[in-house]
Design a protein with these regions (language model features):
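Short, surface-exposed, charged amphipathic helix/loop patches that serve as local interaction elements
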Residues: 2-100
Length: 100
C-alpha cells in the first residue's frame, strides 16, 4: 500500500508515553473490511468514540493499546478519526471535496 491515499500520518498534539519512548506520530493505514468487524459503518462515519477506539488500534503503527486510546488527547482522537472516515470515502467523493 504505497499509494498516499492508503496511509496517513497523524502528528499528535500530546505525545503518547510508552515506557521511556514518546510516540509523537501515528501512521494509519486504510482499513480492509476485516478491520471494521464488530463496528457499524454508520458509527464510524459518525466518528463514534467506541467505534474509533476499536478500529484505530487495528490500523495504526505503532499499534495503540486500549489504555493508550483511552488516554488520548481528544484533539488527537479527532484527527485520527477524520482520517479513518476519509479512508472510507469513494475516490469520486474525495475528488469533489475542497482542499486547503
Amino acid at each position: 500500500m504505497s499509494d498516499k491515499t492508503n496511509e496517513k500520518t497523524v502528528v499528535l498534539d500530546t505525545p503518547i508515553l510508552r515506557g521511556n519512548t514518546e510516540i509523537k506520530e501515528v501512521v494509519l493505514r486504510k482499513p480492509q473490511s476485516g478491520a471494521l468487524r464488530g463496528t457499524r459503518l454508520q458509527a464510524i462515519m459518525d466518528m463514534d468514540v467506541s467505534a474509533m477506539m476499536t478500529v484505530i488500534p487495528r490500523i495504526s503503527t505503532p499499534t495503540l493499546t486500549a489504555q493508550e486510546m483511552a488516554e488520548l488527547d481528544p484533539a488527537d482522537l479527532t484527527a485520527m478519526s477524520v482520517e479513518v472516515v476519509t479512508f472510507l470515502l469513494k475516490k469520486s467523493v474525495l475528488a469533489d471535496l475542497p482542499t486547503a
